[in-house]
């Protein structure tokens, strides 16, 4: 799931970096100290004072997107996810080891994914409110800090996260250790599109009843699993039960098949 962060950052490296450092945007301090909830509050207050401040609105959208990732990571931590054993979307997010995990169930994972989609919708709605075509947001991404354990310990910076996912450091880290990126209006549209894509992937998964066989599919990823009592697994695709097909399938199209192919997002 973390691939959007990688692509958002790497694809934006082509944006020019200015020699003189302008004042840091409001959002950056909260992204660096990991106090995303406080950052949302501060950004909303700034927008109350100046509703046309699209830099603050852009920063709020980024905070909300990053917070969505952190909330997903905290849920994965709660259930003791071993991300290196996962190939499925959303389960590959590296989180600290939890020695006392809760038991995961099909319904519990569904609630986690629904919450993630709701968080993404909030971020997308914020970004949709940006009207200034010349909006800029200059951020040093390296020190964006996640608290996946929810304890204040074992904090993970974005660079540490990217290094784990990449299997090593990126070449640009030597020349740009702060990972300075200047986002513009095109990145607003880009991030909105990714929020839509990830939400659609969640909807695609939730549109199909896959409770039977859930325990087999996540064994090795979660240490404690509650099986689906009384549900036999049907491996025949024609036996899949579509949930609320009239409402969901026209929206998500073929996104379930992307999930079935285990796209590494």
Q: How would you name each of these model-derived features?
A:
Residues 53-56:
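Residue-level recognition of tetratricopeptide repeat
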Residues 17-19:
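Boundary at the C-terminal end of the N-terminal hydrophobic targeting segment
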Residues 4-13:
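Sec-dependent N-terminal signal peptides
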Residues 23-25, 31-41, 65-265:
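Short coil/linker segments at helix-helix boundaries
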